[in-house]
Amino acid sequence: MKTKLLVLAVALSVASAQAADRIAFIPKLVGVGFFTSGGNGAKEAGKELGVDVTYDGPTEPSVSGQVQLINNFVNQGFNAIIVSAVSPDGLCPALKRAMQRGVKVLTWDSDTKPECRSIYINQGTPEQLGSLLVDMASKQVTKPAAKVAFFYSSPTVTDQNQWVKEAKAKIEKEHPQWQVVTTQFGYNDATKSLQTAEGILKAYPDLDAIIAPDANALPAAAQATENLKREGVAIVGFSTPNVMRPYVERGTVKAFGLWDVVQQGKIAVNVADHLLKKGDLNVGDSVDVKGIGVLKVEPNSVQGYQYEAKGNGIVLLPERVVFTKENIDKYDF
């Protein structure tokens, strides 16, 4: 009898272990501090919630690389996938197959088309982030007829193109004399980004500002201005404080923005855990995230989408941050 009970206990233990939820957290690519920080937040939340979180991504930002990872995670039996998409539609076939197999699919940082996921963990609406970019630049640019360049990762990435579209609309409305002289891309490559930034500065010797809403492009733009001794150019955009700290301390960058990407990773895993344990989240529902607070599910329309469906929506981060010399040492990510 004791032997049977022991065997039963072992069997139940194995079944319990097999039933533990596994969540895949996928960046656009590995080796970039921004994404690593998001992954750290995701893994930290996994430990708090008792779920297994795996952080992995392609070495280059490509649809094929992300699709391969998605398919691998599905085949390995992962229960949820959270991905920062390199393309709004390129991942959709793989993600829809995953959902058909019962896998919960969420996006973070950069969205797919909304029908290809359930919830998007969004750092801010395009209007919020596009407006922030222009506001940071306008506080430094004094010339009414300023010349401005946009510089970010690629012409196809969802999030950054939405922000830039809104930023350009705000410039047209509020700073009609500004001239957007060029829009160029670094393709998430540090070397190419530096070369591109230097090329912009050389091509436009009277440039007043570079707006770089990308974790590789912003430090590259700052480094390029130092290399070419172009002190009069305002450099603004989005990146992590640990990457930008030296440029802020040297005065090359006066202000840049971001959101707490560690917090974003935590929120994403908490939302995925809710979907796995408690079921779908609909617009108007809330998720209580330990240490952050209660976050509401918003309609897809806050991102400019027309698609709405049951179990589908957007969770916005509670705030965005502008980093300056005065506050940057309060942050470590």
UniProtKB/Swiss-Prot annotation:
Residues spanning the signal sequence: 1-19
Keyword field: Periplasm, Signal
InterPro entries (UniProt xref): Bact_Solute-Bind_Prot2, LsrB, Peripla_BP_I, SBP_2_dom
GO MF terms, alphabetically ordered: carbohydrate binding
A Pfam family: Peripla_BP_4
Gene3D superfamilies found in the cross-reference section: 3.40.50.2300
CC per GO annotation: ATP-binding cassette (ABC) transporter complex; outer membrane-bounded periplasmic space
Localization per Swiss-Prot or TrEMBL: Periplasm
SUPFAM superfamilies assigned to the protein according to its UniProt record, in alphabetical order: Periplasmic binding protein-like I (SSF53822)
Keyword set includes Ribosomal protein: no
Superkingdom of source: Bacteria
Biological role stated in the UniProt entry: Part of the ABC transporter complex LsrABCD involved in autoinducer 2 (AI-2) import. Binds AI-2 and delivers it to the LsrC and LsrD permeases.
Family: Belongs to the bacterial solute-binding protein 2 family.
Record-linked PANTHER family: ABC TRANSPORTER PERIPLASMIC-BINDING PROTEIN YPHF (PTHR30036:SF7), D-XYLOSE-BINDING PERIPLASMIC PROTEIN (PTHR30036)
Subunit record text: The complex is composed of two ATP-binding proteins (LsrA), two transmembrane proteins (LsrC and LsrD) and a solute-binding protein (LsrB).
Full protein name: Autoinducer 2-binding protein LsrB
Organism (species): Enterobacter sp. (strain 638)
